[in-house]
Design a protein with these regions (language model features):
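Hydrophobic alpha-helical segments and helix pairs
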Residues: 62, 68-109
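Conserved Class I SAM-dependent methyltransferase catalytic core
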Residues: 183-229
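Local beta-strand N-terminus motif with an aromatic residue
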Residues: 27, 75, 148-151, 195
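A short, acidic, amphipathic alpha-helical segment used as a generic capping/interface helix at domain edges
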Residues: 138-142, 178-191
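Conserved proline-anchored active-site loop of SAM-dependent methyltransferases
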Residues: 78-89, 148-164
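S-adenosyl-L-methionine
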Residues: 1-78, 94, 102-150, 237
Length: 237
């Protein structure tokens, strides 16, 4: 995917396609550098420009169910293989976990990299940001065997119908990434990489990822976390 860039950013992404005006963009999206940050813009105006600032996540409680899925792994290496907007990774880092993030989409990776760099310079967020490492890679190909204690997956789930309740950031994520169709390969790679467990975030109504039954699941208010245990793990159902 070609990344369209409008404006003179200090550290432009490699191989960015520079454009002079929005209509020059190759595709529906472009990044606009202004006011010292990137804005994700939609040429079809389906949503306003979106930015990412990890400081906005400070003070938000977030899900308390997700950290429970990583119980006993406070000091272990964890991978977030589908980083997206980084909200879940930030929540876990704020609870003391250390994570390596993987994001293959160039737009989301650029937004994440800029936001993480800014968070590292902000005294309010630096300690949390220090627990996050970002990779621009497809986790289905990049995850090495037995490289993490746990791998977290939040793959895009195709919406059954459009809803006004879907947040703008999620709308953009759906339009940018869509449903990749390689869920089976991603889950298989994650299970090879995890020495303890794989956690898959799913809507309550959704079937298991790639129709592969988990060992057990943990329910949140609107979300289900399916847990796949690694062979010979000390973890129990």
């Amino acid at each position: 995917m070609k990344l369209n860039l409008l404006g003179e950013s200090p550290l432009p992404p490699p191989d960015a396609h520079r454009i002079a005006r929005p209509e020059d963009a190759d595709g529906d999206y472009y990044l606009h550098w202004r006011d010292e940050r990137y804005h994700l813009c939609d040429r079809q105006n389906r949503h306003p420009p979106l930015t990412l600032d990890f400081a906005d996540y400070l003070g938000r409680s977030g899900s308390e169910t997700l950290p429970k899925t990583l119980r006993g792994l406070a000091d272990a290496p964890i991978a977030d293989a589908t980083a997206g907007w980084g909200k879940d990774a930030w929540l876990l880092a704020s609870r003391g976990f250390t994570l390596t993030l993987y994001e293959r989409n160039p737009y989301l990776h650029t937004l994440l990299a800029a936001a993480l760099a800014a968070a590292q310079e902000n005294p309010r967020t630096a300690a949390i940001a220090a627990r996050l490492t970002l990779n621009h890679a497809d986790a289905a190909a990049a995850l090495a065997p037995a490289s993490f204690a746990a791998v977290y997956l939040d793959p895009m789930y195709p919406e059954r119908r459009k809803s006004a309740k879907v947040k703008k950031h999620m709308q953009a994520l759906q339009q940018l990434i869509g449903h990749s169709g390689d869920d089976g390969a991603l889950l298989a790679r994650a299970r090879l990489a995890a020495t303890r467990r794989v956690i898959v975030k799913r809507p309550q109504h959704a079937p298991p990822l790639a129709d592969t039954a988990p060992h057990y699941h943990i329910d949140g208010p609107n979300t289900r976390y399916d847990i796949y245990l690694a062979p010979n793990t000390p973890d129990k159902n």
